[in-house]
Design a protein with these regions (language model features):
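Non-catalytic terminal/accessory segments
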Residues: 1-207
């Protein structure tokens, strides 16, 4: 049996939030469960909280939920809107995971490394590639490139790539094949003999 171990309750009035908090603890105790006090808290959040904090010269609190930091901000029309970005802890964890992943693949060819990276990164961007999180996505891409640059240059004592070479396209041609293999190292994508129909463009997902 799986339990939902994270949840967020939203209330307009502080008294309602406090009452809910106490009732949840009582209800969970009935089933022999308890709240993690260190991870449970009441915060002032939302449009009214932003207005109050502006008068006090402070910023509203933020909270982390499901890998995202939720914070008060404004949309393009200057109206209040909750925005989300990758939480600091999750970002650091994912960067370390990818760094170790690339390190474990350093004996493979560049083609194999990029193919495996694509599979991992596709899942990352399907989850974290949401509205307002573009800066976080680009930052993650940059860290992936740094890790790739670090590990491919450890494969031999002589440096394999400089930074500019890594950001530019590296072209390879398979022996006896008529179509070139194009490695988009700057985007960490591999295209093998890609072709498109006339009048249509092939769009690659950003990393």
């Amino acid at each position: 049996m799986n339990y939902a171990d994270d949840f967020v309750g939203c209330f307009q009035y502080k008294s309602d939030a406090e009452q809910f908090y106490e009732r949840v603890k009582h209800r969970m105790g009935y089933f022999g469960l308890s709240l993690e006090e260190e991870k449970s808290r009441l915060i002032e959040f939302g449009r009214f909280a932003q207005e109050k904090c502006a008068k006090r010269g402070t910023k509203p609190e933020t909270f982390a939920f499901l890998g995202f930091t939720h914070y008060c901000s404004q949309g393009k029309n200057w109206k209040f809107r909750v925005k989300r970005k990758t939480s600091r802890n999750k970002f650091a964890k994912k960067c370390k995971e990818v760094h170790r992943l690339i390190g474990s693949m350093r004996t493979l060819t560049m083609k194999e490394i990029i193919l495996r990276l694509n599979s991992r990164l596709t899942g990352y961007y399907h989850y974290y590639g949401i509205t307002d999180n573009t800066p976080g996505v680009k930052k993650f891409r940059y860290n992936v490139l740094k890790s790739l640059f670090y590990w491919i240059n450890r494969k031999s004592q002589k440096q394999s790539y400089n930074w500019n070479e890594l950001l530019n396209n590296a072209f390879r041609k398979e022996p006896g094949a008529g179509k070139p293999h194009v490695w988009f190292l700057g985007e960490v994508h591999l295209i093998k003999g890609a072709s498109t129909r006339p009048g249509k463009k092939r769009h690659l997902p950003e990393i």
